[in-house]
């Protein structure tokens, strides 16, 4: 139970108390919302779509949580930069996000490591890798790559990652790349990603890192905790 801070710098809050109730099962939590046992619940777009809001006298609000979902390459395994670029050109980001989030009402596409709602976000000078299948095929050919097989790690219980993994497999097949879907539980996948000798070629994941861009340096720094792509950046 949390009590409002009467001395909050923007003025006294209108809500005096908030109680957070831990409900581990999503279906149980949604039922509690429908029955009026809880006043609010954070839901996925898929859950909202299945729920009759009017019949249950509920209102859905969307907001930007500053989360960035990503596909990362394991640079220890996919070592050729041009191959990585070719794979990016093979993929349709909008189709992947539509499949995962139902509607662009629930997402925006960031073209950098910063979320689009960051005051520091910019696309100036950024290569966007919008889908170009012919270019992807040409780049793979120029790199001397054929019959490429890749393993994709993702959290199998995450509906967003599961939907995106299937589309990645389908889209890369169009350029002659075979993708093995290697879904697992969150702990196992996360631990494997940290291991520089892991067998994943690509990973799906996401992060909420706050508003200070310096925080994001841990994604690129050599040996940093969140440099899951094992990119040789800087010390």
Predicted regions and their residues:
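A bilobed periplasmic-binding-protein/Venus flytrap-type ligand-binding module shared by bacterial periplasmic
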Residues: 3-6, 63-86, 90, 99
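Ligand-site clamp/hinge motif
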Residues: 5-51
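Ligand-binding "clamshell"
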Residues: 50-62, 197-199, 213-226
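Periplasmic-binding protein-like
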Residues: 51, 59-73, 78-118, 223-235
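Extracytoplasmic/peripheral linker and loop segments enriched in polar/acidic and small residues
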Residues: 180-189, 216-235
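Structural transition elements
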Residues: 89, 105-142, 158-161
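Ligand/substrate-recognition segments at binding pockets and active sites
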Residues: 141-209
